[in-house]
Design a protein with these regions (language model features):
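SAM/dcSAM-binding transferase cores
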Residues: 198-239
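Residue-level signal for inorganic ion chemistry
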Residues: 31, 117, 149, 207
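Class I SAM-dependent transferase core
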Residues: 1-39
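Conserved Class I SAM-dependent methyltransferase catalytic core
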Residues: 14, 20, 143-200
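Conserved SAM/SAH cofactor-binding pocket of Class I
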Residues: 33-127
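Mobile active-site "lid"/loop adjacent to the S-adenosyl-L-methionine
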Residues: 118-148
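Short, structurally constrained coil/turn elements
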Residues: 9, 88, 180-183, 217
Length: 239
C-alpha cells in the first residue's frame, strides 16, 4: 500500500513509501549528515537512492545540483512522487538507471560527493532471499555490489572527491579493500551504536579519490537513550 509519511523528525519533508516493500529508516539521516563536510559542493549524486530520502535531506543542507539513481522502476516512481509533493523537482534529479552505466552518461571528474546506502548482504547459495523481488534487490547484492560502486565512483568522482557509505560492520574489511583497489583512500570512519553498552550495528565510512593515506576514526555515535528516545546528537541532525 502506498502512503505518505513525514520524514522522521523533519517537520516540512514528506516521503512516499510502499508498506509492502520497505520503509525509510534512520540510516539515510546518518549518511546525509556524515557525508557533508562543507557547503561548497557543486554536484552530488546518491547511488541506490530508493524513494530519495538522502537527496531530500541533502537539499535542506546544501544548495547545489543533486542527483539520485534508482534502478528499480517501481521504487523510482516513488522517488519522483516524493520530489513532487515536496516541490523539489527543480532541485533534485532522479534517474531510473543502473549505477554501473553512469560512466557512459557522465564525464570523468564530474561529482564532488557520492553518497550510497547500498544493499548490505552478499548473495550465495545460503542466502535467504525475500519473496518480493523489490525487497530482495534492496537488501541483497543482486543488482549491484561493492565492486560496482567503487569502480564507477573512481571514474565519475573529481580528484579528491569523496564517497560516503552507510553499511554493516561485518562488511568493513570488504569495503576498505575494495576502496583501495580503486584508488579511493579511506579517510573517515564512525561506528554507530543503538545505545550505550550495545554492539555496533552500523558504520559510516568515507573515502577520497586519490587521497592521502590517513584514516581518522571519529567518536562513536549513539542513537537512543535507555528509554528509546533519540539522543541530542541525533536530534540535532534534523535541524
Amino acid at each position: 500500500m502506498e502512503v505518505v509519511n513525514r520524514l522522521l523528525n523533519y517537520k516540512d519533508l514528506n516521503i512516499v513509501q510502499n508498506t509492502d516493500w520497505f520503509n525509510f529508516s534512520l540510516d539515510s539521516v546518518l549518511l546525509a549528515n556524515f557525508a557533508l563536510q562543507n557547503k561548497s559542493y557543486k554536484n552530488i549524486i546518491d547511488f541506490c537512492t530508493g524513494n530519495a530520502p538522502v537527496p531530500l535531506i541533502l537539499s535542506r543542507k546544501v544548495n547545489c545540483n543533486i542527483t539520485g539513481v534508482e534502478i528499480q522502476k517501481e521504487v523510482y516512481d516513488l522517488a519522483r512522487k516524493t520530489l513532487e509533493i515536496n516541490n523539489l523537482t527543480d532541485r533534485i534529479k532522479i534517474l531510473n538507471m543502473d549505477v554501473k552505466d553512469l560512466a557512459k552518461v557522465y564525464e570523468t571528474d564530474t561529482f564532488d560527493l557520492i553518497t550510497c546506502n547500498p544493499p548490505f548482504f552478499k548473495v550465495n547459495e545460503n542466502s535467504k532471499l525475500n519473496e518480493s523481488v523489490i525487497k530482495t534487490n534492496a537488501r541483497h547484492e543482486t543488482l549491484i555490489n561493492l565492486e560496482d560502486i567503487f569502480s564507477v565512483s573512481k571514474k565519475i568522482l573529481k580528484n579528491n572527491g569523496t564517497i560516503s557509505l552507510v553499511h554493516r560492520p561485518d562488511r568493513l574489511i570488504d569495503i576498505i579493500l575494495c576502496m583501495k583497489k580503486y584508488n579511493i583512500e579511506p579517510k573517515r570512519l564512525q561506528l554507530v551504536y543503538p545505545r550505550y553498552g550495545s554492539e555496533c550495528n552500523m558504520i559510516l565510512i568515507e573515502g577520497a579519490k586519490n587521497g592521502n593515506s590517513s584514516l581518522k576514526i571519529l567518536p562513536p555515535l549513539y542513537v537512543h537513550d535507555k528509554d528509546g528516545n533519540y539522543l541530542e546528537e541525533i536530534k540535532n541532525m534534523f535541524q
